[in-house]
Structures are given as structure tokens and as C-alpha cells.
């Protein structure tokens, strides 16, 4: 029997065997036996040394074809067996897609985060940038550029966590305003920004004070900015947060970085201004401080105070949340009590 006939018989015999294999392990054994170094095809190729020079290329090419054909049959059977394994597994693990799913309990943003996100969205809608800065700040930006030099008595108003003589934990988010004013190109338009974040002061923690709390400060610098612009902005913001029927009033106050300075009260949203314990029977609730940017603050940032002016305001998201939801202890925000926090689950 010549080698070519022997190869044809080898293919026919094993083709049928391969198609009847029932497992991947058995198929792998056949593959090794047929196509391995000790397999019959390799044996045929070794016997080619006894062939003539004319027969050798023909038999070699035919042997390679038989090996490729057997490999193809093995791969086809392998794919069938693998699919059969998958089908069997799917059949044993059938899921009824018509059954209701098990709901996963969803978390929700912290109430302070919700308040801050809402305020940021409001001011972004009015064209403000949202800019954040470092919590470890330079004394220069935290105080001096805010018209509070080292010997200024107003420094006694803020007990500060100092790290070194020139580094501190920021006591307000105003430093980001100073940094931005230094770099802003007013030839490209006005500066409108808010700077939200965490601030630190050496307060004793109690129901209304915390050594760490949140603040959001706003700043607008341009030509021809007036107190009317400030009042309109704050009225819109208070109505957005506390209700469209709210009104505000401005009371004279003092802040080193604004002149004139005002405290902003909103008409009580509990009693409608009639008087109640929330507003201490005055009909008004103090919500934030504001004012027109002091010329010294503009000059410190190399802005011409004779050409440009602006307003600034600072509010506490913690206080806003306490007022809006009737919370009487600021420490509740930081105790991680889920019974308290889940009351403010965000919808959507």
C-alpha cells in the first residue's frame, strides 16, 4: 500500500471517529494521538525518505493536506462540544425573565451635597463658574488679599488653625476668589464665580457650631455693578431655595472685604412673616452676608478700582439645610446616622 492511500484511509477512519466523540477530553486525546510527534501522519512523513525525488513533494503536500483536514474536523467537533456544554448549563440555570427582580437598596447623596449641588446648578444657570481651591491655604490669600492685614482686629473674628506662620487651614473660601481675580482677563468679559468647599475654624462643636463646615462664596466683578444687582441676585437665590414667595431685606453690617456690607434676611418660610419660634417672632431669618467688593481687595489683585467694581456674598450650605428642613443640631450632619440621613433621599 502506497503512502498516499494509507493517508486517505487514515483520514476516513478518524473522520468518523472524531464526529462521534462525546467529550472534550476524549477529543483532545485523539488530537494528540493523530497530530502529535508520535502520530501516524508524522510516521508517514518520516517514511518519505524512501520515496523517489518525484514522489516526495507530492506525498509531502498530500500529508500536510490530510493533517489540515483532520485539524479542521477536530476544531469543528470542539466547537460543537463547547456549545453543547453551554446549552446544558443554560438549560440547568434557566432564568424566568418574567419574574420581578430583587430591588437593590440605593444610596443617596448627603443632604449637604444635595444643597450644594442645587446651589451650584442655580448659579451656573446664571453664568457663574464653579471654582474650587486648596483647603491648606496661604495666609496671604486667606487674609491679606481680603483686606485683613496681620494687625487687623478683624482677625480676632476668626479663630484659625495655623500649620505654620504662613500656612493655615482656610477659614473661608474667599482665597479662591483672590486667586481668580489675580488671573482673570477682564478684556474677555466679567468675572462671575462661586467657590464652594469645606472651611475650618477653631469653634467648640455644639448645636450651631462646628470646627469644620461648608461655605459657598460668590463674586461678580465688572464695570457698573451696583447694589441693585446684588439684591436681585440674592432675591432670586433665596426664592429658589426657600420658595418663590420669599422676600429679602438688607441690614447694614461690617466685613473687611466689602464696603458697604450687609446681612441678608429672608422672610420666614414657616410662618410667612407673621412670627414664630423659627424666626424668633420677627418674621425674618438671617441667611447670609454680602456687600460690594472693597476697593482694597480689587487693588490687591491689580484691578483698577476706579473702573471696576463688584459684589460678593457668602453663605453656609449647612445653615441653609438646617433652616430649610428644620434641623436644630448641625452635628446631625456628621454623625453618619442613617436614620437621620435617609430622610433626605434624593428622588430621580
UniProtKB/Swiss-Prot annotation:
Its main location: cytoplasm. It is found in: Cytoplasm. GO terms for cellular component: cytoplasm. It holds the Pfam family tRNA-synt_2d. GO terms for molecular function: ATP binding; catalytic activity, acting on a protein; magnesium ion binding; phenylalanine-tRNA ligase activity; transferase activity; tRNA binding. GO terms for biological process: phenylalanyl-tRNA aminoacylation. Mg(2+) binds at residue 259. This is Phenylalanine--tRNA ligase alpha subunit. It comes from Lacticaseibacillus paracasei (strain ATCC 334 / BCRC 17002 / CCUG 31169 / CIP 107868 / KCTC 3260 / NRRL B-441). Its cofactor is Mg(2+). Binds 2 magnesium ions per tetramer. Keywords: Aminoacyl-tRNA synthetase, ATP-binding, Cytoplasm, Ligase, Magnesium, Metal-binding, Nucleotide-binding, Protein biosynthesis. Disulfide bonds: none annotated. NCBIfam families: pheS (TIGR00468). Its EC number is 6.1.1.20. CDD domains: PheRS_alpha_core (cd00496). It catalyses: tRNA(Phe) + L-phenylalanine + ATP = L-phenylalanyl-tRNA(Phe) + AMP + diphosphate + H(+). It comes from the Bacteria. Tetramer of two alpha and two beta subunits. Belongs to the class-II aminoacyl-tRNA synthetase family. Phe-tRNA synthetase alpha subunit type 1 subfamily.
